[in-house]
Amino acid sequence: MSDKTVKSTNLMAFIATKMLERQEDLDTCTEMQVEKMKTSTKARLRTESSFAPRTWEDAIKDEILRRSVDTSSLDKWPELKQELENVSDALKADSLWLPMKSLSLYSKVSNQEPNSIPIGEMKHQILTRLKLICSRLEKLDLNLSKAVLGIQNSEDLILIIYNRDICKTTILMIKSLCNSLI
């Protein structure tokens, strides 16, 4: 069993546990996906156990020790997103990769006020960019709604519904920001 696979399993166990601790931030669909990721990770641990016997708790402890930082908040790990980008191909092939990758949406809530926009950039330029982003997100949401018609399995349907929710929430946030800039 490669070290990279073990680290990926540790990371999956750690993220599933931390996301489930923040259940109030999760919608039902995401919570189901995280539970499924937890089940999948436990299955991977059983597969790995013939090489290095470990429990769910061992995998989480290994990840905490590897990090050697305060584990009280996911907000304190800017390197987590980069780590998720560098995990093994086996993990990227997992259908639960998207909810893990979208974890950054839960950990990077910004309270920055519109009046703290960097000096040198005019509001109309910012508004134009935000409106362009919003229109692209609306197009993505439309394409996702069309994709639902051709879905054969429930896992893909859950992922599409989850990503549509993210699109809609982001669109609303951008429109709210645009209104506050006007």
From Swiss-Prot:
InterPro entries: Flu_C_NS2 (IPR005188), Flu_NS2 (IPR000968). Coiled coil: none annotated. It is found in: Virion; Host nucleus. It comes from the Viruses. Keywords: Host nucleus, Host-virus interaction, Transport, Virion. GO terms for cellular component: host cell nucleus; virion component. Interacts with protein M1. May interact with host nucleoporin RAB/HRB and exportin XPO1/CRM1. Belongs to the influenza viruses NEP family. This is Nuclear export protein.
